[in-house]
Structure formats: C-alpha cells, structure tokens
C-alpha cells in the first residue's frame, strides 16, 4: 500500500520541433519509426500492426496507413520538420513518404540509406513459379 504522504510526479511530455522518420520497407512489411535528432524513438507503427496480414502487409496502402499512425502519434510532441531516411527495396517507400507529408510535416530531407553489400552474403535463390 502506498504511503499517504508520497506523490508521484506527472510525466512531462517533451516538445521536439525537428525529427527523423526512419522508414524500413522490406518485401514483407513496412516499419515507420519517428525519432528525435538524437535517435530516441517518439512513435512507431508497422503495416502488420495496423491490421494488415499476409500479402496485404506488403502493399503501398498498408505502408501509408502505418506512416499515418506513426505521424499522428508523434504529433503530440509538437513535431514540425522531418528528415526522412528510407531503407530497403519494398513497395511502401513512396507511399509512406507521401503519407507523412499529408500529415502536415515539412519534409526537409529524403535520404536513401539502403545497405549495399560489397559482395557480401549470397542472395536468396531466384523463385521458380
């Protein structure tokens, strides 16, 4: 039982003006994370967590919904400007950026940070359908 004299402090939301949107677009899913400049996560959303399952997870519309959810959750911190870092070859790259722009953020920079191997791991075998 809590002591009657102790009070817990109310958690103060920090205000962040500039943020970074990390979009990881794989062939199966899209993950959108919005952080501050130091890399501390403010909000995140995924296509799978937005209610899409199976092959619908990897559609541009699912990436758009995930970006809208992450953008609306990050709006509580007072974000105005976003740098966008896009990683991966997935189908949700473009639509996630457009959805963040539609949320009212000023996108200052778009950077592709897809890791490119210098002939590293062997790629998966080609599909035969």
Curated annotation (Swiss-Prot):
GO terms for biological process: translation. The keyword Ribosomal protein applies. GO terms for molecular function: rRNA binding; structural constituent of ribosome. Transmembrane segments: none annotated. One of its GO terms (cellular component) is ribosome. Pfam families: Ribosomal_S11 (PF00411). Disulfide bonds: none annotated. The keyword Transferase does not apply. Keywords: Ribonucleoprotein, Ribosomal protein, RNA-binding, rRNA-binding. InterPro entries: Ribosomal_uS11, Ribosomal_uS11_bac-type, Ribosomal_uS11_CS, Ribosomal_uS11_sf. Located on the platform of the 30S subunit, it bridges several disparate RNA helices of the 16S rRNA. Forms part of the Shine-Dalgarno cleft in the 70S ribosome. Belongs to the universal ribosomal protein uS11 family. Part of the 30S ribosomal subunit. Interacts with proteins S7 and S18. Binds to IF-3. This is Small ribosomal subunit protein uS11.
